[in-house]
């Protein structure tokens, strides 16, 4: 009966996620006054961020080096507007709000500036130094970096107090989370205005501290790395993905890496490898060097046709051990992330991982899943995995601390 369903663990977890979503939306202390956004970089992320802001009613200028680089972004924007806006003239009006500005002539009118160029620190710093003198007072200067520390990127800024991370996720139109990353110099006013801006454009803000990989990429990296290690041991790619999907993940780690882009995955992995204590897999480097970057090039670990990976239909079914390897290494890193102070509390951590990665929503998030499975069970399972596969599975001390609070 419906009454029985209401009291199931799954139902309670989904209700919990509803309230976590409302908590994120409620983080804005006041409505955003932002009306104009300038995005630098018209690649997949920059172009789609610009289109999303225009869809939400803001005036947006999009800058890149040439019109040829901007045209694909405009095509994707038109598709987005036509699919989302059905009222007569609404899609055309949104297209008019999205303007090309190759020279950055209108950057001085923007309330929010978002940098979304390639993950090269020197190039990002040079760009900031070039346009910072032209920015309005009290502007929000955001970088969409996926994992580079803000201290490194903010060197040389005249007003580092206005600088922070605004990390959107791909695909922008589908994933609701934006990590709002505070650097050492970011002031409260900028942080609060950035949170309000994220809410204004219909996204969920996750405040976090600048740390390698921030929240989402930090917990995803060991999950994807474990998948590649399992593949090197002889597990089929399809078996690995099926193990994660059987747990409840929307996409397996191998397909996820292909969809994120293997070049992006490599950038993140190189930044995080020291933190995680896991070397960058040679297989990942080889794929990138060969130009096989995943879905965007039509080939990565899988071959893609019509944006769908071609997977073998017959493969070995995954065993519970493989599922635990993938999920528990993610859980362990999530705990490390919290203990390092990257997020304020465990509820925010759960919200960030679910809304940023699609982590099995019915579990309520990684920490909620650990509580319901049993923290002591998680610790013992991690110890067993550490004996079999190495110290990357050694239980983080935070698990024992969590037991004392239950």
Sequence positions of predicted segments:
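N-terminal glycine-rich phosphate-binding loop for ADP-containing cofactors
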Residues: 1-406
């Amino acid at each position: 009966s419906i009454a029985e369903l209401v009291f199931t663990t799954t139902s309670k977890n989904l209700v919990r996620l509803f309230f976590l979503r409302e908590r994120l939306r409620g983080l804005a202390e006041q409505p955003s006054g932002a009306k104009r956004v300038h995005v630098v970089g018209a690649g997949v992320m920059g172009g789609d961020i610009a289109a999303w802001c225009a869809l939400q009613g803001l005036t947006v200028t999009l800058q890149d080096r040439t019109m040829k680089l901007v045209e694909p972004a405009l095509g994707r924007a038109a598709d987005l507007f036509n699919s989302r806006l059905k009222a007569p003239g609404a899609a055309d009006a949104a297209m008019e709000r999205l303007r090309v500005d190759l020279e950055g002539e209108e950057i001085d009118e923007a309330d929010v500036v978002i940098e979304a160029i390639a993950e090269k620190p020197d190039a990002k710093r040079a760009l900031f130094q070039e346009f910072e003198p032209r920015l309005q007072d009290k502007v929000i200067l955001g970088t969409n970096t996926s994992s580079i520390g803000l201290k490194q990127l903010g060197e040389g800024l005249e007003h580092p107090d206005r600088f922070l991370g605004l990390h959107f996720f791909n695909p922008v139109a589908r994933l609701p989370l934006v990590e709002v990353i505070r650097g050492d110099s970011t002031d409260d006013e900028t942080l609060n205005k950035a949170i309000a801006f994220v809410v204004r454009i219909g996204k969920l803000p996750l405040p976090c501290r600048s740390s390698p990989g921030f929240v989402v990429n930090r917990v995803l990296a060991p999950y994807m790395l474990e998948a590649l290690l399992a593949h090197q041991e002889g597990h089929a790619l399809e078996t690995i993905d099926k193990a994660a999907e059987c747990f409840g993940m929307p996409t397996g780690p191998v397909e996820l890496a292909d969809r994120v882009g293997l070049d992006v995955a490599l950038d993140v992995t190189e930044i995080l490898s020291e933190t995680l204590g896991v070397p960058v897999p040679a297989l990942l480097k080889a794929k990138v060097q060969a130009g096989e970057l995943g879905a965007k090039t039509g080939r990565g670990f899988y071959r893609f046709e019509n944006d769908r990976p071609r997977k073998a239909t017959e493969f070995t079914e995954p065993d519970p051990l493989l599922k635990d390897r993938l999920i528990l290494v993610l859980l362990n890193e999530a705990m490390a992330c919290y203990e390092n102070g990257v997020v304020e509390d465990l509820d925010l951590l759960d919200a960030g991982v679910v809304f940023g990665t699609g982590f099995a929503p019915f579990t309520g998030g990684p920490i909620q899943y650990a509580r319901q499975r049993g923290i002591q069970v998680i610790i013992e399972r991690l110890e067993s995995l550490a004996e079999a596969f190495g110290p990357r599975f050694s239980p983080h001390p935070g698990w024992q601390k969590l037991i004392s609070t239950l």
